[in-house]
């Protein structure tokens, strides 16, 4: 396995400021529900996340701001985005005013695997 690929999982954290080499400068996570796994992710202005995938199918609901996924498009409040488990994408970034996104893991725990699958 490529050593640049790492897996990160958060299950029991109510609120967490998440910092990592793949996240600049950080994002804030707030657990809404454990089952199904629903997190509110707050991106500061222009925050970026590197290429990654999730271990489960994931639905994004854009609540505020602008959420940009390289190779896809810019998402705005009310937009939905669906990603199948194991599909790598990104980088992704918030717009100039930041973004708030609900991330719903539809068939498993919330997690991130950095790099290409």
List where the protein language model places each region.
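A short, N-terminal "cap"/entry segment at the start of jelly-roll beta-barrel domains
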Residues: 1-35, 116-117
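Double-stranded beta-helix
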Residues: 3-6, 90, 94-117
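A short beta-loop-beta micro-motif enriched in histidine and acidic residues
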Residues: 31-37, 43-58, 75
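Short acidic (Asp/Glu) patches
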Residues: 44-46, 63-64, 84-87
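Glycine- and acidic-residue-biased ligand/ion/polar-headgroup-sensing regions
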Residues: 55-70
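Short acidic-glycine-tyrosine-enriched beta hairpin
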Residues: 71-88
């Amino acid at each position: 396995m490529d050593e640049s690929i790492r897996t990160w999982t958060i299950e029991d954290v109510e609120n967490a400021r998440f910092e990592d080499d793949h996240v600049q400068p950080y994002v804030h996570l707030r657990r809404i529900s454990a089952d199904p796994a629903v997190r509110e992710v707050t991106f500061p202005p222009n925050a970026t996340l590197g290429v990654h995938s999730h271990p489960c199918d994931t639905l994004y609901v854009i609540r505020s701001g602008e959420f940009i996924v390289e190779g896809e498009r810019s998402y705005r409040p009310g937009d939905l985005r669906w990603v199948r488990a194991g599909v790598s994408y990104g980088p992704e970034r918030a717009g100039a005013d930041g973004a708030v996104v609900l991330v719903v893991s539809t068939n498993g725990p919330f997690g991130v695997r950095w790099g290409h699958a």
